[in-house]
Amino acid sequence: MNNLTLSLRRERRLLVLLALVCLALLAGALYLQYVKNEDPCPLCIIQRYFFVLIAVFAFIGAGMASGAGVAVTEALIVLSAAAGVGTAARHLYVQLNPGFSCGFDALQPVVDSLPPARWLPGVFKVAGLCETVYPPIFGILLPGWALIAFVLIAVPVAVSLLRHRGRLR
């Protein structure tokens, strides 16, 4: 086996691991929703969508036969994670500055009208407000944990993509 084959095999294994981590994060969110009764807000649901996208792209990338296909899916993962960073940062800002609450979240009808909210309402249906602050986990609010997760996904995948850009063709 040459170095390119070994590198591609390692990338695929890491993509499967990344997808499983994203699914575990979604399972954790569902645990908080159904066991701890922490209703998801529109920004929570949008973050769930980004974790699902990352998992889907990672599984697709793991099944790619070519380095170029892996690189494309890794680029999509980085874009999804970057969008997740923005969403989680906004959510954290809203929770840390709740002064402008009106009791209605304008994003709710938009998020609830997306097809997955009809297909899997228990996972993707809005039930809470973005400014509702639930107890922190190890001193960090839930949007803070999502922000950390998205950064920990985006940075290594982007570095891997840049490092292997010539070898994964």
UniProtKB/Swiss-Prot annotation:
The keyword Disulfide bond applies. Disulfide bonds join 41-44, 102-130. One of its GO terms (cellular component) is plasma membrane. Keywords: Cell inner membrane, Cell membrane, Chaperone, Disulfide bond, Electron transport, Membrane, Oxidoreductase, Redox-active center, Transmembrane, Transmembrane helix, Transport. The chain crosses the membrane at residues 15-31, 50-64, 72-89, 145-163. Belongs to the DsbB family. PANTHER family: DISULFIDE BOND FORMATION PROTEIN B. This is Disulfide bond formation protein B. It comes from Burkholderia pseudomallei (strain K96243).
